[in-house]
């Protein structure tokens, strides 16, 4: 190689050293100094792994003093390059910059610069980069983005609500589905969409204290959203890092009590600039015109400051009209400001509901009915649609569906309230109760008597709680030596049941963690029964492992022993046998227990087994729940109301279970109250609201479409390719499970989203639902999204060289494969990627500028190529550098037409979609006051900003592959 003192070269193998300078040489060796690191390297002159750094007219370079030069001309003087051009900071022309004075920290970011500087990537990395660009662009344009990546069953009514609400600007809605229909999942889907699209970045979830961990687990396990749990300790700790502790995290969960009991803390919450507020159990916010509760006022303050609000609540019929109005008032105080007016409005929606029922019935409509429909919809050009709906034509059903949709839009609260009932949603199992009456052991009788004497001053409520758990009373007196499980007949019954049902999975729930732990030991030691334990003292990871062991079909645990609190938020639909070792204190907890199995998607009827001890509070409670509330075999929306009204009497019977006088009358009274309330709730059902909420056929199609996307084989191939190139170890464990672990030779030392000890993944939704320890990999999973970012945000795979063995072409024939990216820069919340995601445009040019890309498909072509080592590649580049420059210029002239076409299409699509949505809502605003002014203003502003950003869209070269034809 011809070396001269002062020349600048770059190492092919250690590009991180920066630019080197030739400082010494003899007949055989050359020494380079790399000023940016202060290191020297000695190379053999004949075959050194270095590449001469040479810039061309049009490039911009930096001097060692920091100023930049736009090159107009390149001269050579005594083997050294001199660059002549315009200095950018002073705009002085004909400035010279000798190569020896170039900045040594020079970074080559453009693909062509990296290629000419010898920074040549492996061929497989170039292919990965192109695929990443292609798939990322496709995924941005896919419908239902944000709905595909969650670890949930594809349940139509949930998807319908999430799809509708998740795409809105700052949604403010009430989610009021009946228990077991998945309000938490609906809220999570909405959050996932809003965060993924950039519509929201900061989210606050406020829940009752007992549900904090449930939400934390659900958001992480189902949606890969890592929330921070704020309590007193975390709040105090965060005060050291920021004036407002809540600004230290983007996603926060806290309890309602934590939020409201400290004035400064509430102010900090209000000042933290959240994008979305989620409030669970919002029906506990007590409100009246004269005296709203402190909890209600705290949420009201937040709702005034946060643009998007999701309230999760019991059904409106359970709440009562005034309480229901109070929730709507939080969402839109301008719209819902007068309770009396609201009551009147609700009455006026009956004709709309009747009209929808009429259309759904499918019968021919009379002229009066057609006229009434026309009046309700109130649009001038509605006549053809009415005629089509009332005809025998093929499009009659479509016309009826459209009329129903138009009526829905005009329905008073259909945009702010979503409510599904079990009657309106199919797919729930039956519940069958099996009670097992067992004798009260003498040991317990003695302990209860002594406890009664010693606890004479206890309140009736405390005595009632004690009487529910006689083993706890016994343990208090006997201490650690009290082996209650040796004589408690419930233990014998449980062992007998499990041994006679060895092939069935059984969930056992008891109130206390200690009970669960003691039962596990007994089952294991006495009968060798494989039992997993699940309680609040375990970490989330430990609970995951226990749940995964329980989920394993062949070698897994037969039984899972859960404590009351530990089981919150976990669902085990793959099991259908539930044993309640004891009973919870109120109907809500009873429903929560059954709800672990009684979920939509449960494939079998649920067998509920209740072994109870006679003459204890358990015997009282089992009768009251079953005979008084019918709470075991059916969901009980009336349970809390009746529990509150019968509380005093019930407590006395629980505290003194042997005194049964009048108990039958109490049960009868509660049952009558239950039937009356239930009939009242049924009569008050808003059928129109249910139709709107469950989505009908449209929701079914949505679920089916996402299910079809689940079968995308491109994802598996791409993910494996990505993991290989990044350097992540993959161990196939069978059953569609793969274990990923970091290796010692990864592309980056710490791959975001991959734990140090690795993780188990699956591409199958069904497997992910049954194995909580396995992460469900989709295009929306952080591992894939982080992998795409890792490849595309850097220069991995942006320049490479390949050989094409093809005897039909002359040896030395040169082809250049160019990948341009057409893109627009804009704030994430504009969601510009809906219209113009970063879009790759591939070109395959010969030296005459002929583009062969359409004739030569990428994957087919890529398989015909072979790799070149970096050293040989650098020599090839130097030999054909001038030809490559010429081809690049031809590429620049050709890309403009393709890019302009993409940008124009994106502009047209954005204008049509956003203008259409704005026009639709403006028209509806005249007949439905629930469409907010700020929502209309936001859509209009969004449209203008999107179109302006698309006007400024451009393109750039993202990757480059040089291909040389060989016959060997």
UniProtKB/Swiss-Prot annotation:
UniProt cross-references to InterPro entries, sorted A to Z: Helicase_ATP-bd (IPR014001), Helicase_C-like (IPR001650), Helicase_RapA (IPR023949), P-loop_NTPase (IPR027417), RapA_C (IPR022737), SNF2-like_sf (IPR038718), SNF2/RAD54-like_C (IPR049730), SNF2_N (IPR000330)
Helicase ATP-binding domain location: 164-334
UniProt protein name: RNA polymerase-associated protein RapA
Binding positions (ATP): 177-184
Quaternary structure, from the entry: Interacts with the RNAP. Has a higher affinity for the core RNAP than for the holoenzyme. Its ATPase activity is stimulated by binding to RNAP.
GO biological process assignments: regulation of DNA-templated transcription
Keyword Cytoplasm: no
Family assignment from sequence similarity: Belongs to the SNF2/RAD54 helicase family. RapA subfamily.
Keyword terms of this UniProt record: Activator, ATP-binding, DNA-binding, Helicase, Hydrolase, Nucleotide-binding, Transcription, Transcription regulation
Function: Transcription regulator that activates transcription by stimulating RNA polymerase (RNAP) recycling in case of stress conditions such as supercoiled DNA or high salt concentrations. Probably acts by releasing the RNAP, when it is trapped or immobilized on tightly supercoiled DNA. Does not activate transcription on linear DNA. Probably not involved in DNA repair.
Organism field: Salmonella typhi
């Amino acid at each position: 190689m011809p070396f001269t003192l002062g020349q600048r070269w770059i190492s092919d193998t250690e590009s991180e050293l920066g630019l080197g300078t030739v400082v010494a040489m003899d007949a055989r060796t050359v020494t380079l100094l790399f000023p940016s690191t202060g290191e020297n390297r000695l190379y053999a002159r004949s075959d050194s792994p270095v590449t001469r750094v040479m810039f061309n007219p049009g490039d911009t370079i930096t001097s060692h003093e920091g100023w930049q030069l736009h090159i107009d001309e390149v001269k050579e003087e005594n083997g050294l390059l001199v660059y002549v051009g315009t200095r950018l900071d002073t705009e002085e022309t004909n400035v010279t910059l000798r190569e020896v004075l170039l900045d040594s920290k020079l970074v080559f970011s453009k693909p062509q610069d990296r290629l000419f500087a010898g920074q040549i990537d492996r061929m497989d990395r170039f292919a990965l980069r192109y695929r990443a660009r292609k798939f990322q662009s496709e995924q941005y344009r896919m419908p239902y983005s944000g709905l595909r990546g969650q670890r949930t069953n594809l349940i139509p009514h949930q998807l319908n609500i999430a799809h509708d609400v998740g795409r809105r600007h700052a949604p403010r809605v009430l989610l009021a589905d009946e228990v077991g229909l998945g309000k938490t999942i609906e809220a999570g889907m909405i959050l996932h969409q809003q965060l993924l699209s950039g519509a929201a970045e900061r989210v606050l979830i406020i829940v009752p204290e007992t549900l904090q961990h449930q939400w934390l687990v659900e958001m992480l396990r189902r949606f890969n959203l890592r929330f921070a749990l704020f309590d007193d300790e975390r709040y105090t700790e965060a005060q050291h890092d920021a004036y407002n502790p809540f600004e230290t995290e983007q996603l926060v969960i806290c309890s309602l009590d934590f939020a409201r009991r400290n004035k400064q803390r509430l102010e900090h919450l209000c000042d933290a600039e959240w994008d979305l507020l989620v409030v669970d159990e919002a029906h506990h916010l007590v409100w009246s015109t004269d005296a709203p509760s402190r909890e209600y006022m705290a949420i009201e303050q937040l709702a005034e400051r946060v643009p998007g609000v999701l309230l999760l609540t019991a059904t409106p019929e359970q709440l009562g009209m005034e309480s229901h109005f109070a929730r709507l008032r939080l969402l839109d105080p301008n719209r819902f400001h007068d309770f009396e007016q609201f009551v009147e409005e609700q009455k006026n929606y009956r004709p709309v509901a009747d009209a929808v029922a009429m259309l759904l019935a499918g019968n021919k409509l009379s002229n009066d009915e057609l006229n009434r429909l026309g009046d309700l919809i109130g649009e001038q050009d509605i006549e053809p649609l009415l005629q089509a709906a009332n005809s025998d034509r093929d499009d009659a059903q479509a016309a009826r569906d459209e009329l129903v949709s138009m009526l829905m839009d005009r329905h008073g609260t259909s945009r702010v309230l979503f409510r599904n009932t079990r009657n309106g949603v199919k797919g729930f199992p039956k519940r069958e109760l099996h009670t097992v009456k067992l004798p009260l052991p003498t040991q317990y009788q003695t302990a209860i008597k002594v406890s009664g004497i010693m606890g004479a001053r206890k309140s009736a409520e405390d005595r009632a709680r004690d009487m529910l758990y006689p083993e706890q009373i016994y343990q208090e007196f006997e201490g650690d030596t009290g082996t209650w499980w040796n004589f408690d007949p419930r233990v014998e019954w449980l062992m007998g049941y499990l041994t006679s049902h060895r092939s069935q999975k059984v969930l056992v729930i008891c109130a206390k963690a200690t009970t669960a732990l003691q039962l596990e030991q007994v089952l294991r030691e006495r009968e060798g029964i494989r039992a997993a334990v699940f309680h609040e003292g375990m970490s989330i990871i430990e609970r995951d492992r226990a749940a995964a062991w329980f989920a394993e079909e062949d070698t897994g645990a037969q039984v899972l022993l859960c404590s009351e609190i530990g089981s919150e938020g976990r669902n085990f639909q793959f099991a259908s046998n539930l044993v309640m070792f004891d009973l919870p204190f109120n109907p809500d907890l009873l429903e929560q227990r059954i709800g672990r199995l009684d979920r939509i998607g449960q494939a079998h009827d649920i067998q509920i087994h209740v072994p109870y001890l006679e003459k204890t509070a358990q015997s009282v409670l089992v009768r009251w729940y079953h005979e008084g509330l019918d709470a075991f075999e059916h969901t009980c929306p009336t349970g809390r109301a009746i529990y509150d009204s019968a509380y005093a009497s019930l407590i006395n019977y629980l505290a003194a279970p042997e005194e049964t006088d009048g108990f039958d009358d109490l049960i009868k009274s509660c049952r009558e109250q239950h039937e009356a309330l239930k009939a009242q709730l049924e009569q008050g059902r808003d059928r129109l609201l249910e139709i709107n909420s469950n989505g009908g056929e449209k929701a079914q199609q949505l679920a089916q479409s996402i299910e079809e996307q689940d079968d995308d084989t491109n994802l598996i191939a791409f993910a494996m390719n990505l993991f290989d190139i990044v350097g992540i170890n993959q161990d196939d464990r069978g059953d569609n499970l793969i274990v990923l672990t970091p290796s010692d030779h990864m592309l980056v030392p710490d791959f975001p989203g991959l734990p140090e000890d690795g993780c188990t993944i699956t591409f199958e939704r069904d497997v992910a639902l049954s194995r909580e320890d396995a992460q469900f990999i989709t295009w929306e999973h952080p591992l894939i999204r982080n992998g795409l970012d890792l490849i595309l945000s850097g220069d991995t795979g942006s320049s490479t060289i390949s050989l094409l063995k093809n005897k039909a072409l002359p040896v030395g024939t040169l082809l250049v494969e160019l990948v341009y990216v057409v893109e627009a820069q804009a704030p994430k919340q504009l969601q510009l990627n809906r219209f113009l995601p970063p879009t790759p445009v591939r070109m395959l040019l010969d030296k005459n500028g002929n583009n062969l890309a359409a004739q030569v498909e990428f994957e087919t072509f890529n398989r015909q190529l072979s790799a070149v080592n970096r050293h040989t590649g650098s020599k090839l580049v130097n030999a054909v550098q001038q030809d490559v420059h010429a081809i690049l210029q031809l590429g620049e002239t050709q890309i403009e037409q393709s890019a302009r076409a993409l940008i124009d299409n994106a502009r047209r699509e954005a204008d049509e979609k956003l203008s259409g949505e704005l026009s639709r809502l403006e028209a509806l605003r005249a007949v439905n006051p629930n469409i907010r002014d700020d929502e209309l203003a936001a859509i209009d502003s969004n449209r203008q900003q999107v179109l302006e950003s698309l006007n400024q869209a451009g393109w750039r070269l993202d990757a480059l592959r040089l291909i040389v034809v060989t016959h060997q």
